């Protein structure tokens, strides 16, 4: 269960980071806020068609660090990491699930569906049924219908 303070902090940082990142032609993929022993670790993942460069990361880190400092977020000392999402890109927003239909994904749920909490399979569809968003996953030649609101974590799976 995510602490409500951490959830709000993540949302606040997302709201500040998204326009900064978009102004450089990039897309915000994920914000992680982790409380370490004496400081916060804030991780920003961003992407764009064609990939992210080291210069992109450096520029966004400088700009976003200034913005976070002005808004006193997080409220204690922090380390800011800015990077591309990598090969195991997190799937966070609805458009991520639409974009990566047909790809292999790893999904962890807050409660079991059909007796399973962790899924690894092909994302076949992302649909809405009776006002609820559903992922259709093929795993071991069987189809599973997973409610979006049960997902704790979802990532692409890269095969070498």
Swiss-Prot record:
Subcellular location: Cytoplasm
Classification via CDD domains: YlxS_C (cd01734)
UniProt key word Cytoplasm: yes
Coiled coil stretches, renumbered: none
Main location: cytoplasm
UniProt superkingdom: Bacteria
Keywords, comma-separated and alphabetical: Cytoplasm, Ribosome biogenesis
GO biological process: ribosomal small subunit assembly; translation
InterPro entries: Ribosome_maturation_RimP, RimP_C, RimP_C_sf, RimP_N, RimP_N_sf
A Pfam family of this chain: RimP_N
Gene Ontology cellular-component terms listed: cytosol
Similarity annotation: Belongs to the RimP family.
Protein role: Required for maturation of 30S ribosomal subunits.
Protein name: Ribosome maturation factor RimP
Originating species: Syntrophus aciditrophicus (strain SB)
């Amino acid at each position: 269960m995510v602490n409500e303070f951490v959830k709000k902090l993540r949302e606040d940082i997302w709201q500040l980071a998204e326009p900064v990142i978009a102004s450089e032609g990039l897309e915000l993929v994920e914000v992680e806020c982790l409380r370490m022993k004496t400081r916060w670790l804030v991780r920003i993942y961003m992407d764009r068609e064609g990939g992210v460069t080291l210069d992109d990361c450096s520029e966004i880190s400088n700009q976003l660090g200034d913005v976070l400092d002005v808004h006193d977020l997080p409220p204690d000392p922090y380390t800011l990491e800015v990077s591309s999402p990598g090969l195991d890109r997190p799937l966070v927003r609805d458009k991520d699930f639409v974009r990566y239909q047909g790809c292999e994904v790893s999904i962890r749920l807050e409660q079991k569906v059909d007796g399973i909490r962790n899924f690894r399979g092909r994302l076949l569809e992302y649909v809405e049924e009776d006002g609820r968003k559903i992922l259709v996953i093929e795993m071991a030649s069987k189809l599973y219908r997973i409610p979006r609101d049960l997902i704790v974590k979802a990532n692409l799976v890269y095969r070498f």
